[in-house]
Amino acid sequence: MNNRQINSLWSSIIIEELIRQGADFFCISPGSRSTPLTVAIARNPKARWKMFADERSAAFFALGYGRATARPAVLICTSGTAVANYFPAIVEASMDFQPILVLSADRPFELLECGANQTIRQENIFGSYTRWHMQLPVPSKEIPLKALLSTIAHAVVKTIGSPAGPVHLNQPFREPLEPEIPDLKDAWAAPLQEWLENGKPSGKSALPEKEPDAETLSLLREALAVAKEPLIIAGNMQKPEEAEAVEQLALELQIPLYTDFSSGLRLKSTTRPWQLAFASPHFTRHFKPDLVLHFGGHIIAKQPAAAIREWKPKHYIVVKNHANRLSPDHNVTLSIEASIASTAAKLKGCRTLSSGIINAATEEFFRRAEEEIDAECIGNKPVTEISAARLVSRLITAQQRLFLSNSMPVRDMDNFACSSHPHAIRSAINRGASGIDGIISTAAGFAEGDGKSTTLIIGDIAFLHDLNALSLLGAMTVPLQIIVLNNNGGGIFSFLPIAEYRDLMETHFATPQNYSIRSAAETFGLDYACPQTNQEFTRCYLEATGSPRSIIIELRSNRAENLHHHRALQARIETLTNHLYQGFIEKISEQPN
C-alpha cells in the first residue's frame, strides 16, 4: 500500500468503529490535515454529520448533542488553533459529566517545534479536563490494526463511563492526504477480515453503576430515623430516572423536597417552589433542618447553601454518582458515591420523627406567593423578564424542550417558574462551569440530539457572544424558539454590589451593545417578533411553538426597571412570609421537645 491508501484505510477503520460503538454523529470543521478523516465520514453511509465553519460553535453543538443523547458526538478538526477552539466546551463537558469525543488531526513528529506552518503542541492540550487522552501514531503498516480498533473502543467507553466526560484522540498524518481506495486483501488488513464482514463493534464494555453498600444504607436509615426536621435537595441530575426516584422518596417519607431547576423536577405539579421560601430570612430563621440529604450536583440559588451554613445541621449528606468532591462550603458530613436512583429507592420505607408542620405551614405561603407571581403575567401588562419565565414555564408542553442560558434566565426560571405540569419537562443548562459562551450552539445541539422543538431563553450579551451559531438554524431538523431578554447589557450586574459604583457600572460591567437583534434575524433568514405585552407574548410564543421555522423573539426591557420589578416582588413575598410565619412560630412552640 502507498501512503494515501494507508491513511484512507486507517481513517476508515477509526470512523467505522466509532459508529459501531454508538458514536455516529460527527461535527466536522473543514481543514486540510483532517482530510483522511473527513473523507472517511463522507463515504460511510452510516455516518451522520454536520459541517461547522467555527470550531468553537461545533464543540458546543457537540456538547448539546451529548446532553440530549448521553452519547458522544465526535469533533473533527485540522491542526493548529482549530483544536484550541474546543477548550471552553471541553471544560463545560468535563465539569458537568457530558460525553464528547475530540478527534483532532495533527502534523507528524518531524514537523513539531521546527517552525512548520499551522503547527502547535496538540497532545494533551486539554490537560486534566479529559477523562482520557491518547496520542495516536502516524498511520503505518508497522502498527497492528487491532490495536487501533481496541483504542477507539476504549475511547468511547471512557467518554460515557463514570464519570462521563471528554476524550481526546490526537491523530497525526503525513502527506499525501488525498484519498485512495486501499487493498483490503493486503496482509496488513488480514487480521480484520472478520471485523470487516460482521458489522459488529470490536468489543463492548459493561458499565454498571455503583450500588450503595449495606453499611452506607444503614448509616442513612439511622440518620433519617432520628431526624426531626429533614430536608431533601434534588440537585443537578443527569437522568430522568434519578430525579423520579428522589421525588418518590420525598413523597413517601413526606419530607420537604427542594427541587433545583437542573434536577428536571422544578416544573412538575408534585413539587413546590421552595426557592421563594429560602429567599426569605423569616423562613430560614424558623425552619432549621437537622438533616439535609442532597442528591445530585450543585444547585443554582445561593440561599439554600447560605441557610445550611447558618443552620449547621447534624447531618449534611450528599449522594452522587461520581467521585468528585461536592462540598464548596466544606461542611458535608457524609459523601456517598453510588447510583442516585438505587440509593433513593432503597431508602423507601424509612421513618423519621418529622412533625410535618413545615409542609402544612408552607402550603398557604406557596399558594399566595404563586398568586403574586401570576399577577405579573396579567395580559395587558408589559412583558417582563419575570413574566416571560413564568409564561414559558406554564405554556411549554411535554412534547417540547427547554434550554436556559446562564446568568439571569436560569435564575428567573428557577425562582418564578410555574409548577403545574403532570410530567417533567425535559430541560438543560450549561451549569458545569456556568459560562454564557456557546449557548445558542449548545441549545441547537441539544435540539438536534433530542429531535424535539426547543425553546431557548437567553440574555442579549450571551446572544451576541454566540451570534454566528444562528447560521446553524436554517439546516436544523427541528426548530428553535430563541427568546432574547434584551436589557442592553449584563443585567445580572444590577443585582450585585458593583452596581453601587456608578462610575464603573455602565462602562466596565453592564457594557451596553446597542446592536439590532432584528437585523441579526434578517441576516440569518430567521423569523422575528418583538411582543410588548404578556398577551402579545403568549400569542407569539404559542404560534412559534407550532411553526416548523426557527424564530427570534426579542423582549426589550430596561435594566433599572427589571431590578425594581424583582425587588418589589421579593418585598411583597417577604411581607407575606413575615405575616404567615407568625402562626408557624406559634405552632412550633406548641410541639413537645
Curated annotation (Swiss-Prot):
Note on how the cofactor is bound: Binds 1 thiamine pyrophosphate per subunit.
EC supergroup of this enzyme: transferase
GO BP of this protein: menaquinone biosynthetic process
Superkingdom, natural source: Bacteria
Co-factor(s): Mg(2+); Mn(2+); thiamine diphosphate
Record-listed E.C. numbers: 2.2.1.9
PANTHER family named among the record's database cross-references: 2-SUCCINYL-5-ENOLPYRUVYL-6-HYDROXY-3-CYCLOHEXENE-1-CARBOXYLATE SYNTHASE, PROTEIN PHYLLO, CHLOROPLASTIC
Subunit text: Homodimer.
UniProt similarity note: Belongs to the TPP enzyme family. MenD subfamily.
Protein name, entry field: 2-succinyl-5-enolpyruvyl-6-hydroxy-3-cyclohexene-1-carboxylate synthase
Gene: menD
